Each structure stands twice: as C-alpha cells, then as structure tokens.
Amino acid sequence: MSRYTKKDFPPHNVRRFLEPGPIVLVSSAHKGRTNIMTMGWHMMMEFSPSLVGCLISSGNHSFEMVKASRQCVINVPTADLAATVVKIGNTSGRDIDKFKSFGLSQKPAEQVRGPLIDECYANFECRLSDSSWVRKYNVFVFEVVKAHVASSPKYPKTIHYRGDGEFMISGENTGRWRRLFRPGML
C-alpha cells in the first residue's frame, strides 16, 4: 500500500478529485423550443426510484427551460463526441439551435417533452421530483421515469471533467475486488 507525501492545496480546486460521473448532455423543451447543455455536476441520490441530483447554473439558458417545464432528458455521450460536448458547453441556446449547429439528431421521448439525443449511448427521461434545493443551490432532483441504453458496448468510454479544461476518458473495468463487495452494505 502506498503512502503519499502531500502539500497544501486550494480548497476551491478539490473538484478535480471529486467530480462525479461522466459529463452528460441535458436536453430540454419548453414553449416550442429545444436546448442542450453540457453538465458535469450530477449525482445519484437514490436507487429506487432512481433519483438524480443535477446542478444547473441559474445563469444558464437551460435553467429556466428545465425549471419551467419540470423535466429533461439526461443523455450520456461517449468519448467520440468529446469535441462536440465541449463546443455545446461553450455556446448558449439563447443564441443558436444547438441540435442544428452541432448536427445532432432529436428523437421524441416517450414520457417527457425533452428530446432524446440519438447519437448518445444512453438517454434518461426525467421529471422533477424535488425542487426544494433549486432556490438555494440550483440543484434539481429528478426521477428517471424511462431509460434507453445501447446494448453494446457494455462499458462505453465516457468523458469526465477534471477541472480547468482537463478531461479524462473512462478507463479499464475490473471485477478484481468483486468477492470483497457486499451489496447489502449499500
């Protein structure tokens, strides 16, 4: 087991080590308009029902669309979409139609109004479950009401944000410690 020599580190940069899961694309629809935003701040909050907490900045165009419609689609892109994902994050849906500008295909969702992004590996249709944290923290708690996941590959290469413009691609999967794992402890 390794021991590490440590130095002081700026607390505002700890996100580099704690960023949650993969970067996702949140698609939304309201009053005849659609939008896509890039999001890295999300977390699983419950297994059943599947609840996902999502931080959306109040200055973001998607914030108002999601707040008003009370629903969205969380789309999981793979590494081959990395450049597009970054470009989407650098533009505002107030100014452009992101689906057209970035050549992405909209597919109708089954249970919400926001469109699925067909080029993404997975699409999770979500309805707002709890808005009590929106005013104070800009955190929406969504319930996944319908999930669509590609059958292959089993573990796609996803994009993860490390902070300050640094990204990571998901790596090797291993079952090496599976025998130590106790699901009852979750």
Predicted features by range, described:
Residues 1-186:
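Basic, polyanion-binding surface patches
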